[in-house]
Amino acid sequence: MGAEVQHFENELASFLGVQVGQVVCVNSGTAAVMLATQAAVSLGDEVLVQSLTFVGTYQAIHAAGAVPVSCEVLPETATIDLVDAARRITPRTRAIMPVHYASNPGDLDAIYRFAAQHGLRVIEDAAHAFGCTYRGQMIGSFGDVQCFSFDGIKNITSGEGGAVVSADPVMLGRVKDARLLGIERDTERRFAGQRSWEFDVKRPGHRCHMSNVLAAIGRVQLQRFAGEFAPQRVALAWRYRELLAPLPGLALFATDLGPIVPHLQPVRVLGGRRDALRTHLQAAGVETGIHWKPNHLLTLFGGGKTPLPVTEQVYGELLSLPLHPGLQHGDVERVCSAVQDFFQHN
């Protein structure tokens, strides 16, 4: 950790429109969620979070010593259902973690009202949402705390990495210390070239700092984002929407492509035909994914003992089509042609 990390943090702050010092880079998005959770809540506290998210979200909460409480999603957006979340509040609930699924932040106004009503911290898992806006404001420029991911397939990559963004100085101080084994103020000393061998540790910490090499990659990626990566992702998502919206066997998520830069291109395949379509596309040379298996079905997080019927239905319909800035419109059209062919014959 050194000058490149400091430069990357400062450039991210400028991009997001926040003050220098409000961005803390770490070595993964999972680490960002873990450190933010550890800084925001205490051991044994509960965090409301949708089950339909990458297991890294749950493992990060678990590693922070908190308890993830699985909630339903809204089928139209695959974002957290606040009505269901309200039913799961207990005296131990201390935070809500909205997941910006496929770059869609959902109704953040409602989420922050909900949090204020119940006295909760809001830790946004914005791993998919770098570069997205909400009501004209950049995700990361407002609210409580946001966690970004810069792994190899995200909107920008540093090879591997993540960041915590917050205007809360107590939160930031805890995250900065915890990313480097809990050593108090070590980040500031290192950046100032005044590293001291005399230090104290008062809170648990981890080895989660970002290296200079990863930060240097991230800086170049950030320079390419607005003019290259973002417009290409948006254009490809629009083309998918134009070609797939008319198909009666598919449901597209209710996403406004104006303010978001889509990380994924998920669709819902209706009528129990998801797996058949996936097999058809594989035979046509089209790789697909399923984002994600709900966490409440995983052994560590309940093994399905508490059913979430809406989430389970959405999961059974989910299929992610190829989306990355290296694709061209012709690639999207070939994928959609294979999808159309399936529905014409099934």
Residue ranges and their predicted role:
Residues 47, 96, 146, 162-164, ...:
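Well-ordered beta-strand positions enriched in small/hydrophobic/aromatic, beta-favoring residues
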Residues 124-158, 197-202:
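Conserved active-site segment immediately N-terminal to the catalytic lysine
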Residues 141-185:
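Active-site PLP attachment segment
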Residues 24, 48, 69, 122-123, ...:
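Structural detector of well-ordered beta-strand residues that form the stable sheet scaffold
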Residues 3-11, 17-21, 83, 95-99, ...:
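PLP-dependent aminotransferase class I/II
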Residues 1-46, 60-63, 70-72, 137:
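Phosphate-binding glycine-rich loop
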Residues 52, 66, 73, 127-128, ...:
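Histidine-centered beta-alpha loop that forms part of the nucleotide-sugar donor binding/catalytic region
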